[in-house]
Curated annotation (Swiss-Prot):
Belongs to the universal ribosomal protein uL3 family. Residues 218-257 are annotated as: Disordered. It comes from Sphingopyxis alaskensis (strain DSM 13593 / LMG 18877 / RB2256) (Sphingomonas alaskensis). One of its GO terms (biological process) is translation. Residues 225-236 have a biased composition (Low complexity). Part of the 50S ribosomal subunit. Forms a cluster with proteins L14 and L19. Keywords: Methylation, Ribonucleoprotein, Ribosomal protein, RNA-binding, rRNA-binding. GO terms for cellular component: cytosolic large ribosomal subunit. This is Large ribosomal subunit protein uL3. One of the primary rRNA binding proteins, it binds directly near the 3'-end of the 23S rRNA, where it nucleates assembly of the 50S subunit. One of its GO terms (molecular function) is structural constituent of ribosome. It holds the Pfam family Ribosomal_L3.
Length: 257
C-alpha cells in the first residue's frame, strides 16, 4: 500500500483524446507535497507517512508544529495529512512527491469536503417528492411530512431525513480515472468532477477496491530529495588531474621561496 498525495483543486476543463473525443477533467495541483514525518512500527506501533502541502506563515503555525517543521528542515505547510503505508513503502523525510506518482489510466479515490449549500429543505437535501398542489394540501407542499409515530416509539429515530445543513461534509469519491499527468507543472487531470470547491485541499489515493496499476511507481515517484548536503549545480568540479597540477604548482612555489 503506497502513500497518497495532497492536491489542491484548481477547476475544470476538457482534454481532447487522439480519436477526437473530448473528456471533462478536474485539474489538481501538487504544491510542495513533502514528507514531514515518518511513523515507525517499533516507536509508534504502526507505519505511516506524514505529508504536508502548500505554504503557511510561521506566525500562523503553533509553536510545537514549528519545531516539527524545523526538525524536518521543511517550510511550514498549510495542510498536514497522515497516510498509512506498507512496511516497505516509507519515504525519507523532506522528499517531495511528483505528479508522476500516478499514471494515465489509473483509478484513484479522492477525499475532500463537499461544497456547502447552507440550510436546505427535505426536497433539495434528500430528493423528497413533496406533497400535492391541491386536494386538501395547504402550506405543506414542500414539507417532509411525518417524522414518527405516537406513544410508540415516542421519539424521532436517529438519522431521520429532515431539513438541515446541506453539504460541507467529508466525502470520498471512488474509482476516478487519471486521464493525464504533468510532472513539470505538478498537475493531475482527473476524469469528471471531484468533491470540494476551487482552492480546496483533496487527498488522492490508489483505488482501494482495485489492484494497483502495474506501471505505478513503488513506493513513490520522488520529485526531489531534501535534507541532502549537495554542492550547488554551478560549482566547478575539479578532476583528479587538475588537482595534481594545482598541488605540483604549490610545491614548486614553496621550493623556490
Amino acid at each position: 500500500m503506497r502513500t497518497g498525495v495532497i492536491a489542491k483543486k484548481m477547476g475544470m476543463t476538457r482534454l481532447f483524446q487522439d480519436d477526437g473525443r473530448h473528456v471533462p477533467v478536474t485539474v489538481l495541483s501538487l504544491e510542495g507535497c513533502q514528507v514531514v514525518s515518518v511513523r515507525d512500527k517499533e516507536r509508534d506501533g504502526y507505519v505511516a507517512v506524514q505529508l504536508g502541502a502548500g505554504t503557511a506563515k510561521a506566525k500562523n503555525v503553533a509553536k510545537p508544529q514549528r519545531g516539527a517543521y524545523g526538525k524536518a528542515e521543511v517550510e511550514p505547510k498549510a495542510k498536514l495529512v497522515e497516510f498509512r503505508v506498507a512496511d516497505d513503502a516509507t519515504l525519507d523525510v523532506g522528499a517531495e512527491l511528483s505528479a508522476d506518482h500516478f499514471v494515465a489510466g489509473q483509478m484513484v479515490d479522492i477525499q475532500g469536503v463537499t461544497q456547502g449549500k447552507g440550510f436546505a429543505g427535505a426536497m433539495k437535501r434528500w430528493g423528497f417528492g413533496g406533497m400535492r398542489a391541491t386536494h386538501g394540501v395547504s402550506i405543506s407542499h414542500r414539507a417532509h411530512g411525518s417524522t414518527g409515530n405516537r406513544q410508540d416509539p415516542g421519539r424521532v429515530f436517529k438519522n431521520k431525513k429532515m431539513a438541515g445543513h446541506m453539504g460541507a461534509r467529508n466525502r470520498t469519491q471512488q474509482n476516478l480515472e487519471i486521464v493525464r499527468t504533468d510532472a513539470e507543472r505538478g498537475l493531475l487531470f482527473v476524469k469528471g468532477s471531484v468533491p470540494g470547491s476551487k482552492g480546496g485541499w483533496l487527498l488522492v489515493r490508489d483505488a482501494v477496491k482495485l489492484p494497483r496499476h502495474p506501471e505505478a511507481p513503488y513506493p513513490a515517484s520522488i520529485k526531489s530529495a531534501a535534507n541532502t548536503n549537495t554542492a550547488p549545480a554551478d560549482a566547478p568540479v575539479e578532476t583528479p588531474a587538475e588537482e595534481a597540477v594545482v598541488d605540483t604548482a604549490a610545491t614548486d612555489g614553496a621550493q623556490e621561496s
